[in-house]
């Protein structure tokens, strides 16, 4: 996959950031995206030391004009789009169903579901014309498991997995692959915001058969695989990387 043109949304932190570094180390040309200009430019500068070619393009995945411009600028910069990692996401408001509101639902779904829908729409526009490409969406173990206290987040990730599988079926004949990675608890700011306390994190770890949280690089490695030709026969796959949570 070396020298491929790759776009990563939600690249400024967590899994998206780890994926950007992992893909750059493979020699790929990368465009990283997020909502914060200063942090994005700093990330792109770091990546240039690895990839040689790395650019930051500011975009809010909830806004279609931003997403269209992001994809178009990526293609203008590199001439094509070989892979895309849709990592932008939010944990939403923690708490039971009875404490959720229309606003908390919309805030979570706008980023986690609409953002991926719009990203895939415009990535696929380019990839189908090329008749090649790979998209990897970042879901969650809670995209196929329930979790008390994160109902809206879980529902949004269930939707991501449905979008992934449906899009994969729609475009497979064009030579484009769509898959997802489903992490378990990963050592990120999102996890710390969700668990809130050391006790909360310990309770979550107790649900993981491996008895530890994962590292962003462990998810990034799976993303690199799904982006690459080594996963050429993987279509509509949701790859669980969750320390065994999905095995039970």
Question: Where do the language-model regions lie?
Answer:
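Residue(s) in the substrate-gating loop at a strand-loop-helix junction
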Residues: 140
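Conserved mid-core segment of classical short-chain dehydrogenase/reductases
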Residues: 68, 91-106, 129, 149-152, ...
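Alpha-helical segment proximal to the catalytic Tyr-Lys
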Residues: 125, 169-173, 232
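Short, flexible catalytic-loop segment of classical short-chain dehydrogenase/reductase
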Residues: 161, 182-193
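Short C-terminal tail/terminal secondary-structure segment
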Residues: 91-94, 145, 224, 235-248
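Active-site helix of classical SDR
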Residues: 120, 156, 164
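Conserved glycine-rich cofactor-binding loop
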Residues: 12-13, 36
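Catalytic Tyr-X3-Lys loop
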Residues: 98-117, 132, 136, 160, ...
């Amino acid at each position: 996959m070396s020298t491929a043109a790759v776009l990563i949304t939600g690249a400024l932190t967590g899994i998206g950031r780890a994926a950007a570094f992992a893909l750059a180390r493979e020699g790929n040309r990368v465009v990283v995206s997020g909502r914060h200009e200063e942090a994005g430019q700093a990330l792109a500068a770091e990546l240039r030391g690895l990839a040689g070619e790395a650019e930051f393009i500011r975009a809010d995945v909830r806004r279609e004009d931003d997403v269209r411009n992001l994809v178009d600028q990526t293609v203008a910069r590199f001439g094509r789009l070989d892979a895309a990692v849709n990592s932008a996401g939010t944990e939403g408001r923690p708490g039971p169903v009875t404490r959720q509101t229309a606003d908390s639902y919309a805030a979570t779904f706008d980023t986690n579901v609409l953002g991926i829908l719009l990203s895939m729409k415009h990535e696929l526009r380019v990839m189908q014309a090329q008749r090649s490409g790979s998209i990897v969406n970042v879901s969650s173990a809670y995209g196929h498991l329930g979790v008390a206290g994160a109902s809206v987040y879980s529902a949004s990730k269930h939707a991501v997995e449905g979008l992934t599988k449906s899009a994969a079926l729609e475009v497979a004949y064009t030579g484009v692959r769509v898959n997802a990675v489903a992490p378990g608890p990963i050592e990120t700011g999102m996890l710390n915001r969700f668990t809130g306390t050391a006790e909360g994190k310990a309770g979550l770890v107790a649900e993981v058969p491996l008895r530890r949280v994962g590292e962003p690089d462990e998810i990034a490695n799976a993303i690199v695989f799904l982006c690459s030709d080594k996963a050429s026969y993987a279509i509509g796959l949701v790859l669980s990387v969750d320390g065994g949570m999905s095995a039970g």
